[in-house]
């Protein structure tokens, strides 16, 4: 089954038509990040999620491009330029944002002696700054305090109410302010050492509440939810299919859920339409953000926002494992209730750990990603202005963590070792070798065909294995990233080829080669390997990859005169030498 096939899956239940997916010929690939709560500053977990989503958006535009094939006749020409246009807004759409309502925000604002709106206005820009610092190119950054979002939530509520899936009732149960979540009795641990009931899932305290709220008939959607989860909404890889099993278990035990709180207990939020004494549940409010960024409610066909209607539904929604109940159970049920198409894919990740402990405000073990970017450069570079290429380092380390398989521990020592070994030594030194004055006095790379390569390097099994790896790397990379949802393993595949490339140049020792053509052929093969690896790593380290490609004489801007010269002489002139690809930390 194709990872991103676009079938129109429908099922009829309770006289409602449930759209599991919709199709549109002109639809951009729509990716969403969960919006982040503003009760605390951004940490590494936020950076991981946004970088993952951004890298996926970039790879969406890069995959299956012909330039990923080695030894093409025109590989020195200007055909490279379009590949760098991976942020074309007509191809992908990435949304990020901040969740600004709820009890936790009120408490944080109170601690800082300011009103909630002022507090949100101070905190939300920090998350935008994080995106900019890590080169996350979002198309829309939504804040739930924006007027457009309030309008969207009100419209969604009205449609829910009109569907007959809401009712007023006395709600009694466990509620966690920390999680902004209602829990069933079986989800509570009342026997822990603290003596305070906590959520088994998160370990956060819960309290018993009794309120007169609006309830959503979540239990009536059990069958439809099971069918949707079975339709392949989570990737089929073992590391992702486990989330479908967890979601199925939640659905099995699901009951109707409260989707409002009394204003007397929660004033900071969006009020229920026509009932100012009730505040809409913060998670319903937050989930609707994915509709808001598409211009929902799409009421005016002449409105520019209405054109965004073609975005829906999301092609991928990224989420952390702690919010799976909301994205894989509550959210699809809400969409079913109002007959809107459901997300096509959910991709769930584990947590970034610090010293094997999850980051939390209470533990005080948050790491500020922007501060960490500078700290990675080590003490001697404290006053150094970070270059775009250097700012990719943290992004690289985070995306190398196996968080789509299990929790991963971050440490500065580990990060520096990874950067020095993989980026500085394996890739950077390899680039330096083939562009050095002693090894490449011509300052150019000759074009070599696959037939010439096979003729010159057909006697050594290690050479044959290396060239086969180079032929197949884009396919293996795509299989791991796109179909198995394992980007960290895709990166490892690139590193495997880089190691083979280093071994190749060591075997043939071009620095001892007396025949210029043989020496230049070895350099050409190494350059071609670096080119393809740099392109595949662009979604992960966009600036560093461009720096590498520039040194090889490959540009994303048009350089027609140079390109024609390259083609006529079957060489590619090296780009400007601006120093080492990346300095050792």
Task: Give the residues covered by each predicted segment.
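A charged helix-plus-loop insertion that forms the helical arch/lid used to bind
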Residues: 108-121
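Long, amphipathic alpha-helical stalk/connector segments used for oligomerization, subunit docking
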Residues: 403-414, 419-423, 437, 441-463, ...
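A glycine-rich helix N-cap at a beta->alpha junction
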Residues: 125-139
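Short, charge-patterned binding micro-sites
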Residues: 98-104
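Feature captures the FAD/FMN-dependent oxidoreductase FAD-binding
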Residues: 146-165
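Structured secondary-structure scaffolds
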Residues: 24-64, 71, 80, 84-89, ...
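Cys/His-rich short segments
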Residues: 163-222, 226
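Basic, alpha-helical terminal appendages of large translation-related enzymes
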Residues: 2-28, 68, 74-87, 93, ...
